[in-house]
Amino acid sequence: SVKIEEGQGDKGGHFVPDRIVLQGMVFYGYHGVFGSEKELGQRYEVDLELALDLSSTGRTDDLEYGINYVDLYQLVREIVEERSYNLMEGLAEAIASEVLSNYPMAEVTVAVRKPQPPAGGLMDFFGVKITRKK
């Protein structure tokens, strides 16, 4: 559990310049509109950016005042690998909702990419990027 000091969190709706970033997380999931996507599964890439005041964590240099990145990674992994959604929008929304519910922050940005999607041609990825606030 994270200790919250005065001023940490959403700062009363004010701009929070600090960020925690988890970039390029790779998971194997079973999401998609087509049956084959849900049966065979495929690789998904997820980026997460949390906006919160990190001054207490930096000042104390104590994880008790911060967010454990490994726990955050495991939460995202569980959502991507153990649940199934038709759309990347649904997957991104679930990640944002769970992260906002479990951690003290002003907002979260979630990007989900599906590399080499079934598009009938060559393409790097399909993707969505959403930002949600408390």
Predicted regions: what they are:
Residues 2-7, 11-134:
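N-terminal, polar/charged subdomain of small-to-medium soluble alpha/beta proteins
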